[in-house]
Amino acid sequence: MASVYLDSCMVIGLIEGDATQRQLLKKQLVKHVIYSSELVRLEVRLLAVRNDNRESLQKFERFFTACEMIDLNRAVFEQATLLRAKTNLKTPDALHLAAAIHSCCQELWTDDKQLKTTATHYLEVVDWPTLDSMK
């Protein structure tokens, strides 16, 4: 099974997206080991916490419980620093990419344009149009 790091937009699509997005992601993810990080957890839960949406929070927690969680340790931050210096990625995006690389993920699923452009130099990138073509 291939290993995949899902960035925040993909996790939100999986949990709170429209029915088509959710089905498409679920169908493709069964073939993968899913990696995530506390950074993704922070980003995706923000609105649910702000709105006290307990149902969404429970769905997110079930998702993260099923993931391999990447420790954002000093080595990941060092790699993120180098990526940010070389590519001018935003700090969170540099951390997402560094986490995926550090964990030897084969794929990064994102729809962030700048992150996609940079990540293609390091691993396979899957975005919404790519997922849509896999139907």
What do the predicted segments below correspond to?
Residues 1-3, 101-135:
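Acidic, PIN/NYN-like endoribonuclease modules and their adjacent C-terminal/linker elements
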